C-alpha cells in the first residue's frame, strides 16, 4: 500500500533518516517507537506529504487515503457543534442530504417529475453512503471517547484543546481512511476512552501507524513495531513487549558476532605484524591481509538508550499522617465534585489517583496541595515538605533563565554535575541545557518543571500527568526513582504501565466520594473485573485488597469446556515444540561458524523472526482460551 524506499532526510546537516526503508501493508497495525528527537513525527509528516524527503521515495497505491492526527490540530477552532464537526467525516453524505432538503423544499411549491426523479436518485445515493446511520455512528464514537449526550450539541470552541483533539480523533475514525496515522493519541484521553479507542483500532479495517509512549496501549493495539534508531527503520513482527525481547536477543547475537570477529582480526593482525618481514611467511601474511579485507564487518551494538539514574533525597521524614481530609465538599456552581468525603494519606503511601476526565482528579490534587479553596478540613501532618508538579507550574519558570540556571536556583543543594545528569534523564542534551526557558516548547517546559519538582527535598509529592512529555527511557528512570522514594506521593496518570509499577494504593472518585483500593493497579483491575462479572443486584462492599482465588475443582463439564480444554492441551504442545525449536535455533546462531558469516546469520535470524511471530500468536490464543475457560467454570460454580 505504501512503500518507503531508501529515504534520507536531513535537518541542518544532521541525518534524521539515511537510506531508510519500510513497507506498510493494508492491514498493518504498526507502533513507531524511538527516542524523542529521532524523527518519528517527522516520518508521519513525510508519509502524509506535509514534508518532502531529500533522497529516496515514498510511493502510495492509487486508492490509498491517509488520515493524520497530530498535535497541530490542538489549535483547530469552529463555531459548529461537535456532532456537526465529527459528521464532517461523511462529507458526501452530508452534501447529498443538503441537496435532498433543497429539492424537498422546492417540491412544496413546484411539483415536477424531474424533481421527483432527482430526489429518488439522491435518496438512493444517500442510502448507499450510509447517510441514514451517519449521525448514530458519530454519536457512538463521540460518546465512546468520553463526550456526554448533552455535549454533542455544544460548539467546539467551548472545549479545551484536549477535548477538541478528541473531536478531531472521532472525525478521523469515522472517515475510515486506508491508513490512519496517530501521533500521541492517548495524551488527551482518560482511561475509559483509551480502552474504547484500543478496542476500535484492534478491529479497524485498514492500516494504522501509531506514535505513542503508552506501552500498554501499544501492546493492546499493534502487531508490528518499527524502531527509529541510528537514522534507520528497524522492523519487529510483534507488539512492544515482543520488540523488547527480540531486540535484546538480536543485540546479544550481534555483539557476540562482533566480539568474535574482532578477536579473529586481532589474531590475524598480530600474525601479520610478527611475520611481515619474513620472506618465508609472505604468502601466509598476504593470505591473512586478503582475509581481513574480504570480511563483511559486523558492527558493534551501540546502546543509544543508556541513561543516568537518579534518586530522590530528603533529610526530614514526615510524621505518620501526611494529609487528613475531613468532611470535604467542593463544587463549581451546579457541578458537584466532592460531597462530605474523608480521606487520609499516611507516610509511605504511594497513591495513583485514576478515573475519567471531569471527575475532579486535578481538583483533588490542588486541594491536597492547599492551592484550591474547599469546604471542610484539610490538615497537613508534622514535618511535611511538599512538592507539586502540574501544568500551571510552568508559569513559575523564569523565562530569561537558562535551563541549568533554573535548576541551580531551585536551592536543592545538588552539584552542577548532578543537575546536568538529572537534565540528561529528562531528555536535555549538554547543549540544550544552556537554552533559555523562553525558547522552549510546552513539552520541554513541562520537563524542566518536573525536574525542578523532583530535585526538591520534598517528602510528599503531588504529580499531575508526569509522563506526558517523556519517552520510554525517561519514564523508566522516573519509575525507578519513585519505586525507591522513601516519602509519600499522589500521582494523577492515565498511563497504566506507569501506575502499575509505582502505586501501592488506588484512589478514584465515585458518587462525589474519594474511594480507596488498598493494593496495586493490577490487583485493582482484577477486583473491578470480578465486580463486573458479578450478577449481584446489591452494591459491592467497600473494596479490599484481594488475592487471586485458589483454583477450585470444576463441578461439571460441558461440551464447550471440553472443546476448549482439548484445544488448550494442543496449544501447550505446540508452544513447547516451538520453544524447543527456538532454543535449538539460538544455539545454532551462537556457534562461531554461523555468527561469523553474516549472510548465514541473517537467514537464521529471519527463521527466528517467523518462529517468534508464530509463538506470539500461539501464546495470545492460549491466554484467550484460559480466560474463556475461567468464565465458563465461574458459571458452573
Region spans (language model):
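ABC ATP-binding cassette signature C-motif
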Residues: 1-258, 307, 311-637
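Active-site phosphate-binding and catalytic loops of NTP-dependent enzymes
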Residues: 152, 280, 299-304, 376
Amino acid at each position: 500500500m505504501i512503500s518507503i524506499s531508501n529515504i534520507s532526510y536531513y535537518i541542518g546537516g544532521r541525518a534524521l533518516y539515511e537510506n531508510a526503508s519500510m513497507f506498510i501493508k493494508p492491514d498493518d497495525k504498526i507502533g513507531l517507537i524511538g527516542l524523542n528527537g529521532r524523527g518519528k513525527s517527522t516520518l508521519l509528516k513525510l508519509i502524509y506529504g506535509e514534508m518532502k524527503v531529500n533522497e529516496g521515495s515514498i510511493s502510495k497505491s492509487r486508492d490509498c487515503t491517509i488520515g493524520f492526527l497530530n498535535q497541530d490540530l490542538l489549535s483547530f477552532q469552529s463555531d459548529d457543534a461537535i456532532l456537526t464537526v465529527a459528521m464532517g467525516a461523511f462529507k458526501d453524505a452530508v452534501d447529498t442530504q443538503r441537496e435532498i432538503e433543497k429539492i424537498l423544499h422546492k417540491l412544496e411549491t413546484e411539483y415536477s417529475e424531474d424533481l421527483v426523479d432527482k430526489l429518488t436518485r439522491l435518496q438512493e445515493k444517500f442510502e448507499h453512503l450510509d447517510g441514514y446511520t451517519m449521525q448514530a455512528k458519530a454519536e457512538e464514537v463521540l460518546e465512546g471517547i468520553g463526550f456526554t449526550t448533552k455535549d454533542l450539541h455544544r460548539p467546539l470552541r467551548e472545549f479545551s484543546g484536549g477535548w477538541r483533539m478528541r473531536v478531531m480523533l472521532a472525525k478521523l475514525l469515522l472517515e475510515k481512511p486506508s491508513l490512519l496515522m496517530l501521533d500521541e493519541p492517548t495524551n488527551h484521553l482518560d482511561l475509559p476512552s483509551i480502552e474504547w479507542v484500543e478496542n476500535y483500532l484492534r478491529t479497524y479495517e485498514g492500516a494504522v501507524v501509531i506514535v505513542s509512549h503508552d506501552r500498554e496501549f501499544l501492546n493492546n493495539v499493534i502487531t508490528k513495531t518499527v524502531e527509529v534508531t541510528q537514522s534507520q527503520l528497524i522492523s519487529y513482527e510483534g507488539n512492544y513487549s515482543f520488540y523488547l525481547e527480540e531486540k535484546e536477543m538480536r543485540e546479544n547475537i550481534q555483539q557476540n558476532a562482533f566480539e568474535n570477529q574482532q578477536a579473529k582480526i586481532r589474531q590475524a593482525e598480530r600474525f601479520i605484524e610478527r611475520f611481515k618481514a619474513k620472506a618465508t611467511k609472505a604468502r601466509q601474511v598476504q593470505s591473512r591481509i586478503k582475509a581481513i579485507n574480504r570480511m563483511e564487518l559486523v558492527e558493534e551494538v551501540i546502546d543509544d538508550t543508556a541513561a543516568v539514574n537518579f534518586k530522590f533525597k530528603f533529610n526530614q521524614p514526615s510524621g505518620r499522617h501526611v494529609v487528613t481530609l475531613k468532611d470535604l465538599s467542593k463544587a463549581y456552581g451546579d457541578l458537584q465534585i466532592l460531597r462530605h468525603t474523608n480521606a487520609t494519606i499516611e507516610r509511605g503511601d504511594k497513591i495513583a489517583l485514576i478515573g475519567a476526565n471531569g471527575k475532579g482528579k486535578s481538583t483533588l490534587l490542588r486541594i491536597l496541595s492547599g492551592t484550591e479553596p474547599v469546604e471542610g478540613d484539610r490538615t497537613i501532618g508534622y514535618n511535611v515538605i511538599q512538592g507539586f508538579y502540574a501544568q500551571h507550574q510552568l508559569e513559575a519558570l523564569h523565562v530569561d533563565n537558562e535551563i541549568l540556571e533554573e535548576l541551580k536556583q531551585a536551592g536543592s543543594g545538588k552539584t552542577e554535575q548532578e543537575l546536568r545528569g538529572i537534565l540528561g534523564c529528562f531528555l536535555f542534551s549538554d547543549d540544550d541545557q544552556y537554552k533559555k526557558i523562553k525558547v522552549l516548547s510546552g513539552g520541554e517546559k513541562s520537563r524542566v518543571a518536573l525536574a525542578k519538582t523532583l530535585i526538591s527535598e520534598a517528602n510528599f509529592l503531588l504529580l499531575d500527568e508526569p509522563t506526558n512529555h517523556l519517552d520510554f527511557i525517561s519514564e523508566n528512570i522516573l519509575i525507578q526513582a519513585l519505586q525507591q522514594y522513601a516519602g509519600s506521593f499522589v500521582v494523577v496518570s492515565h498511563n497504566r504501565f506507569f501506575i502499575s509499577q509505582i502505586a501501592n494504593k488506588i484512589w478514584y472518585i465515585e458518587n462525589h466520594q474519594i474511594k480507596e483500593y488498598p493494593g496495586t493497579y493490577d490487583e485493582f483491575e482484577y477486583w473491578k473485573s470480578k465486580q463486573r462479572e458479578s450478577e449481584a443486584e446489591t452494591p459491592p462492599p467497600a473494596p479490599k485488597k484481594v488475592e487471586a482465588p485458589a483454583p477450585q475443582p470444576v463441578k461439571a463439564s460441558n461440551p464447550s469446556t471440553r472443546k476448549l480444554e482439548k484445544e488448550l492441551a494442543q496449544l501447550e504442545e505446540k508452544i513447547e515444540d516451538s520453544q524447543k525449536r527456538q532454543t535449538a535455533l539460538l544455539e545454532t546462531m551462537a556457534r562461531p561458524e554461523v555468527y561469523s558469516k553474516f549472510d548465514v546469520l541473517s537467514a537464521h535470524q529471519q527463521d527466528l523472526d517467523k518462529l517468534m511471530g508464530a509463538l506470539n500468536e500461539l501464546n495470545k490464543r492460549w491466554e484467550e482460551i484460559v480466560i474463556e475457560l475461567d468464565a465458563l467454570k465461574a458459571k458452573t460454580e
